[in-house]
């Protein structure tokens, strides 16, 4: 079990969510499963500067009625499946890497100072790869062909 710092001190920003309907569709096939129990998930989030931010969600665990899986959890909005960080954290890291052109270790230091998040080097690299996958290469090459043709105009 991972160590989790105490959540709920006065300097923390906590957003509570409840995602636990009686029935929820399977993520693979869409067949509805029945809720068996409820767990609490704590996901690190980026909200305000110099404050730790969390999403604390009560999430339903469902028994599948299909052959895709035995059990599954309800999806939390803006959090990847089995994710420890929200998509906003991933987006903030990707912006620091690409738009601000910061090196990996500077991004780690910045996230620690600004948002009190201790991120690993592997997670920073995964955010960079995720941002690279978001690029639509067909539209990129169309842009390059129209704006940077091989003919030089004088």
Q: What role is predicted for each listed range?
A:
Residues 1-80:
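Short, flexible loop/hinge motifs at secondary-structure junctions
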Residues 48-151:
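Short, positively charged, Gly/Tyr-enriched micro-motifs
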Residues 154:
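Extended mixed-charge, aromatic/glycine-enriched low-complexity segments
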